C-alpha cells in the first residue's frame, strides 16, 4: 500500500518514550518465587504506587514510566521506580529481580483474582500456569496508526538484534538451558505471541486481529502479544520482544536504540519505502537463533537470510540509526553503552560467568541479579 500521511504528522526527531518493566519477587535464600506482589504494591506510595501494575502472577510486579521526551528523564524515572519497588520488596521479605524467566522454581502459580486472568487461565489451561516470565516493553509515540503499522513491517528484520541485546534468561529450574533467552522459548507456547506478521495496512491489521478473536485464539485485542504492535491502549508503537534488562543502563540503551530505529524507519515510510515481505518461517528462525545465541554467536540477517556474527549486525543497527541518535542528542551515550555491553556481555552472559566462577552456584547468580536490579545511589 502507499502510505498517506496524517494531517499533523509527528516530528520524528522528538518522539516520546515510555517503558514498562516486569520484575520477579524471589526468596533471597532459595531463589524461589514469592507470592507477595500484593504486599509489595501496598508498600508503594506516591508516584511509584501510581506507576505500578499488578501482573499475571502473585510473584510479579510491573513498573511503568510516565511518557518522557529524553533519555535523562527516562533514566531518572527508571531509577526511582526500581528503587521504590526494591525497597517495598525487601519489606515484604523478597528480592526484586530483573530476569527474563523464573530461574529456580515457582511453587505458587495461581493467577491473581481478576476476571480477565481467570478467563485466560480457563481458555489456555496449563500454558497460563507456566513459570513467570518478565519482559521490557518500549513504547514510542507514533499517533498515526497507518504509519505505525508500516513501521512494524519495517522493524521485522531488526527485532532479532534487539532480542539478542536484551537476552537475560539462561536459567530454568536451576539449570542453564543453553539458551540466552529461555523466556522466548517458553512464550512460544502461547498462540498470540511471536513475530509480528506483515500487514498491508491498518485495516488489514484490524481485520486479522478480529479474525483471531473470532477463532478463539485470543480473548480480545489486548492479547495481541506480537513482538511489535501498534499499542492497543496508547498512540504508540510498542516493542515487546526483549527480556527485562538487568540494569537501568541496559534499559535506557535499548529504549534509545528502539526510538531511533522507529524514527529512522518512519522517515523511510514517509519517503515511500516499502518493507520487504520476509517469509514467516525465516523470521521465526531468526528469533530462535537470537534467543539461543544472544550476542555470543551468530544471528540471522533477515535482509539476506544468511547467518552472520551477532556484533556485526549490532554495528550495522547502530550505523543505521546513528543520524537519528545524533539529532536526538543520544549518539555519544549509545556509543558508550554499546562499548560497555560489548565488554560486559548480555545479561545471560553475565549470569553464565558467575556460574562458571562459582561452580554453578545459582544462589550467587540470584544475588548478582538482585544487586544489578536495584540502582546504586548517586
UniProtKB/Swiss-Prot annotation:
Q: Name one GO biological process term.
A: modified amino acid biosynthetic process
Q: Does the keyword section mention Ligase?
A: yes
The protein's Enzyme Commission number: 6.3.2.2
What Pfam families does this protein map onto?
GCS2
Q: Which UniProt keywords apply?
A: ATP-binding, Ligase, Nucleotide-binding
* Cross-referenced SUPFAM superfamilies: Glutamine synthetase/guanido kinase (SSF55931)
Query: GO: which molecular function terms?
Result: ATP binding; glutamate-cysteine ligase activity
Task: Write out the catalysed reaction.
Answer: L-cysteine + L-glutamate + ATP = gamma-L-glutamyl-L-cysteine + ADP + phosphate + H(+)
This protein's source sits in the domain of life called Bacteria
| Claim: Chaperone is one of the keywords in the record | no
Which family, according to UniProt?
Belongs to the glutamate--cysteine ligase type 2 family. YbdK subfamily.
* UniProt xrefs under NCBIfam families: gshA_cyan_rel (TIGR02050), PRK13517.1-1 (NF010041)
Q: What does this chain do?
A: ATP-dependent carboxylate-amine ligase which exhibits weak glutamate--cysteine ligase activity.
Its name, as the record gives it, is: Putative glutamate--cysteine ligase 2
Upper lineage: Bacteria, Bacillati, Actinomycetota, Actinomycetes, Micromonosporales
Amino acid at each position: 500500500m502507499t502510505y498517506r500521511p496524517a494531517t499533523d504528522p509527528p516530528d520524528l526527531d522528538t518522539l516520546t518514550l515510555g517503558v514498562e518493566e516486569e520484575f520477579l519477587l524471589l526468596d533471597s535464600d532459595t531463589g524461589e518465587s514469592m507470592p507477595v506482589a500484593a504486599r509489595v504494591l501496598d508498600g508503594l506510595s506516591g508516584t511509584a504506587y501510581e506507576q505500578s501494575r499488578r501482573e499475571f502472577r502473585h510473584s510479579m510486579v510491573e513498573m511503568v514510566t510516565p511518557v518522557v521526551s529524553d533519555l535523562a528523564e527516562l533514566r531518572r524515572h527508571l531509577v526511582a521506580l526500581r528503587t521504590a519497588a526494591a525497597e517495598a520488596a525487601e519489606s515484604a521479605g523478597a528480592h526484586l529481580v530483573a530476569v527474563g524467566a523464573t530461574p529456580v522454581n515457582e511453587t505458587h502459580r495461581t493467577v491473581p483474582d481478576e476476571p480477565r486472568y481467570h478467563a485466560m487461565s480457563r481458555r489456555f489451561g496449563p500454558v497460563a500456569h507456566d513459570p513467570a516470565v518478565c519482559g521490557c516493553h518500549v513504547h514510542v509515540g507514533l499517533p498515526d496508526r497507518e504509519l505505525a503499522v508500516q513501521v512494524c513491517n519495517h522493524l521485522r528484520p531488526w527485532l532479532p538484534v534487539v532480542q539478542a541485546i536484551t537476552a537475560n534468561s539462561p536459567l530454568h529450574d536451576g539449570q542453564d538451558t543453553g539458551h540466552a533467552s529461555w523466556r522466548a522459548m517458553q512464550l512460544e507456547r502461547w498462540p498470540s505471541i511471536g513475530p509480528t506478521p506483515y500487514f498491508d495496512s491498518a485495516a488489514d491489521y484490524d481485520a486479522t486481529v478480529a479474525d483471531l478473536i473470532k477463532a478463539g485464539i485470543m480473548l480480545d485485542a489486548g492479547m495481541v502479544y506480537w513482538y511489535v504492535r501498534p499499542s492497543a491502549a496508547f498512540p504508540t508503537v510498542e516493542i515487546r520482544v526483549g527480556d527485562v534488562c538487568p540494569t537501568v543502563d541496559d534499559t535506557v540503551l535499548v529504549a534509545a536504540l528502539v526510538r531511533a530505529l522507529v524514527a529512522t524507519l518512519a522517515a523511510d515510510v514517509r519517503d515511500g519505502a516499502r518493507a520487504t515481505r520476509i517469509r514467516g518461517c525465516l523470521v521465526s528462525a531468526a528469533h530462535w537463533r537470537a534467543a539461543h545465541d544472544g550476542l555470543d554467536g551468530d544471528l540471522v540477517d533477515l535482509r539476506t537470510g544468511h547467518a552472520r556474527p551477532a556484533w556485526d549486525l549490532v554495528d550495522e543497527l547502530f550505523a543505521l540509526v546513528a543520524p537519528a541518535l545524533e539529532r536526538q542528542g543520544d549518539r555519544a551515550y549509545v556509543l558508550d553503552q554499546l562499548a560497555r555491553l560489548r565488554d560486559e556481555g548480555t545479561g545471560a552472559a553475565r549470569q553464565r560467568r558467575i556460574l562458571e566462577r562459582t561452580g554453578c552456584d545459582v544462589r550467587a547468580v540470584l544475588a548478582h541479579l538482585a544487586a544489578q536490579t536495584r540502582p546504586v545511589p548517586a
